[in-house]
Amino acid sequence: MKRTFQPSNLVRKRRHGFRSRMITVTGRAILKKRRAKGRHKLSA
């Protein structure tokens, strides 16, 4: 059985990156919450 986590920086950026967060309303809500919490890193 292969492992479930097969790291790829491209897929990581496309799925969880800042620009992908910005295109959806819920994604923007996530960024807003993370800013409010004071997260140093907003997205992947």
Swiss-Prot record:
Source organism superkingdom: Bacteria
InterPro entries tied to this protein: Ribosomal_bL34, Ribosomal_bL34_CS
One BP annotation, GO: translation
Keywords from the named record: Ribonucleoprotein, Ribosomal protein
GO terms, molecular function: structural constituent of ribosome
A cellular component annotation (GO) from this entry: ribonucleoprotein complex
Keyword Ribonucleoprotein listed: yes
One protein family per Pfam: Ribosomal_L34
HAMAP family documented for this protein: Ribosomal_bL34
Protein family membership: Belongs to the bacterial ribosomal protein bL34 family.
Name this protein carries in UniProt: Large ribosomal subunit protein bL34
Organism: Rickettsia typhi (strain ATCC VR-144 / Wilmington)
Lineage of the organism: Bacteria, Pseudomonadati, Pseudomonadota, Alphaproteobacteria, Rickettsiales
